[in-house]
Regions:
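A feature for loop-to-transmembrane-helix boundaries and adjacent hydrophobic helices
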Residues: 1-266
Length: 266
C-alpha cells in the first residue's frame, strides 16, 4: 500500500446553483483557447494575421471534436453509453480519440488556410506546440473523470481511484499510474522543445509538425503499455499501440524528408 498518493476528485461536475459544469468539457474549452492563443502568437510573429487563425480555429476545432469523437466511437463502440445513438455525442462523459481529432481538424484547418492563400506548411509548424499545449491541458479532464489511468503502483505519485471506477480485476488495488500526469509533463516538455528548436535552428516546415507527430506518438508507445482501460486488440496488443508505432516512424521519416528538400518559400 502506498503511503502517499495523488488524490482524485470524487465527481466530474461542479454545481453552481441550477447550472452544472462538466469539468471535462470546461477543460476542453481551456485547452482549445490555449492552443489558439499560442498559435496566434507564433503566427503573428511570422508576419501572419489573427484573422486567419480565428477562421482556421472555428472550422478546425469543430472538425477536430467530430474527428476525435468519431475515432473513439469507432475504436471503442462497446464502451459508448446506452442508448448508443445518444452516447455517440456524449463528449462530456469523456471519450475523445486524439488522433482522429488531429487528423480531421488539421485537414479542415489546412483547407481553410489554403483557401485564404496562407502557407499551409508554415501554419502547421506554428500550430504544433499549441496542439501539444492543448493536449496537455486536456488530460486534466481524464483526472476529473477518473479514467485512462495505468496499472496499479505503490509509487508515491500513484493516483488514488475510487472503488466504483476501478476495473473488476483491479478492485483490490487503490493507487494506479497517473498516465494523465505523465502525458501532461511529456506534452508540455515537447512543446517547449519545439518552440526552442524553431527559434534556434533553421527547421524547414513542416519539420516541427513532423517532430510533433513523432514525439507524441513515441510517448503513446510507452503509455499504451501502461494503460489498463478496455481497448481493441490486434495480434494480442492494443490497437492504439500499433497506431503509435506507425505514426512515430511516419513522423521521423517525414521530418528527415522535409529537411533534405529545398526550403519552402510560399
Amino acid at each position: 500500500m502506498s503511503l502517499a498518493s495523488i488524490p482524485s476528485p470524487h465527481t466530474g461536475t461542479i454545481d453552481l446553483g441550477p447550472l452544472t459544469i462538466h469539468m471535462y468539457g470546461l477543460t476542453l474549452l481551456v485547452a482549445i483557447a490555449a492552443c489558439i492563443l499560442l498559435t496566434g502568437y507564433r503566427w503573428t510573429r511570422q508576419g501572419g494575421d489573427w484573422d486567419l487563425i480565428l477562421k482556421v480555429a472555428v472550422w478546425g476545432v469543430a472538425a477536430g471534436i467530430v474527428g476525435a469523437r468519431a475515432y473513439h466511437d469507432i475504436t471503442s463502440w462497446n464502451e459508448v453509453s446506452s442508448p448508443k445513438w445518444k452516447g455517440v455525442f456524449a463528449v462530456w462523459q469523456g471519450g475523445l480519440g486524439v488522433w482522429g481529432g488531429i487528423l480531421l481538424g488539421c485537414l479542415v484547418g489546412a483547407y481553410v488556410a489554403h483557401r485564404e492563400g496562407a502557407s499551409v506548411l508554415k501554419l502547421m509548424d506554428a500550430v504544433a506546440p499549441g496542439l501539444l499545449l492543448a493536449q496537455g491541458i486536456g488530460r486534466w479532464g481524464n483526472w476529473w473523470n477518473q479514467e485512462l489511468y495505468g496499472k496499479p503502483t505503490s509509487l508515491p505519485w500513484g493516483l488514488k481511484i475510487d472503488p466504483e471506477n476501478r476495473p473488476a480485476q483491479y478492485a483490490d488495488f487503490t493507487t494506479f499510474h497517473p498516465t494523465f500526469l505523465y502525458e501532461i509533463i511529456w506534452n508540455l516538455s515537447l512543446a517547449g522543445f519545439l518552440v526552442w528548436l524553431g527559434h534556434h535552428r533553421n527547421i524547414r516546415p513542416p519539420g516541427l509538425f513532423a517532430l510533433y507527430v513523432a514525439g507524441y506518438s513515441a510517448f503513446r508507445i510507452f503509455e499504451e503499455t501502461v494503460r489498463i482501460d478496455p481497448a481493441h486488440h490486434f495480434l494480442g496488443l492494443r490497437l492504439n499501440l500499433f497506431v503509435a508505432v506507425t505514426l512515430t516512424i511516419v513522423g521521423l521519416v517525414w521530418f528527415a524528408r522535409t529537411q533534405r528538400r529545398a526550403p519552402v518559400t510560399t
